From Swiss-Prot:
Functional note: IF-3 binds to the 30S ribosomal subunit and shifts the equilibrium between 70S ribosomes and their 50S and 30S subunits in favor of the free subunits, thus enhancing the availability of 30S subunits on which protein synthesis initiation begins.
Species for this entry: Rhizobium leguminosarum bv. trifolii (strain WSM2304)
Subunit record text: Monomer.
GO biological process: ribosome disassembly
Keyword Cytoplasm: yes
Keyword set includes Protein biosynthesis: yes
Localization annotation: Cytoplasm
Principal place of residence: cytoplasm
Renumbered residue ranges of the record's region Disordered: 1-20
Protein known as: Translation initiation factor IF-3
Pfam families given in the database record: IF3_C, IF3_N
């Protein structure tokens, strides 16, 4: 049973620093990157305070833990910048759809292919959908032929992720950039 009004300990993110390091001895790396060997934690804290910096635990899983004398604020700032840069570089792959009919004109086909090329340049996947109307369902081979032509025209910059298949009155194929 929990005690009323007792809050859990706050969850700390980032490495332990200064007084949070409660191990008797640590492997110390100085502010300029030199290895100072195994040092008592009190002495390491004193050295960090004299330098006006913080004692930060770098590798807690080794015996003794590796600590470094550095500016904790600068370390946190650098980590935030690195995380923001990684988030910025992440590209969410979207699936763009190109709709056609089996009896598409050559110029219309070229315009659709140009749009498809633009989508691949942006790193997006393309879903090619062929819609059949009325009696066009009797000539599914024309639709398959058109999708094979799309596949052949995009081989240098795209690969087929999902082969052409018929679902109801639509034939679909998914292409992904190489």
């Amino acid at each position: 049973m929990r005690r009323p009004f007792k809050t859990d300990a706050p969850v700390k993110d980032g490495p332990r620093s200064n007084r949070e390091i409660r191990i008797p001895k640590v492997q110390l790396i100085g502010a300029d990157g030199e290895n100072m060997g195994v040092v008592p934690t009190d002495q390491a804290l004193r050295m960090a305070e004299e330098a006006g910096l913080d004692l930060v635990e770098i590798s807690p899983n080794v015996e003794p833990p590796v600590c470094k004398i550095l500016d904790l604020g600068k370390l946190k700032y650098a980590n935030q910048k690195k995380a923001a840069e990684a988030r910025k570089k992440q590209k969410i792959v979207e699936v763009k759809e190109i709709k056609m009919r089996p009896n598409i004109d050559t110029h219309d086909y070229e315009v659709k292919m140009k749009a498809m090329g633009r989508f691949f340049d942006e790193g997006d996947k393309v879903k090619v959908t062929l819609k059949f109307r009325g009696r066009e369902m009797a000539h599914q081979e024309l639709g398959m032929k058109l999708l094979q032509q799309v596949k052949a025209d995009t081989t240098e910059f795209a690969k087929v992720e999902a082969e052409p298949k018929l679902e109801g009155r639509q034939m679909m194929m998914v292409l992904a950039p190489k």
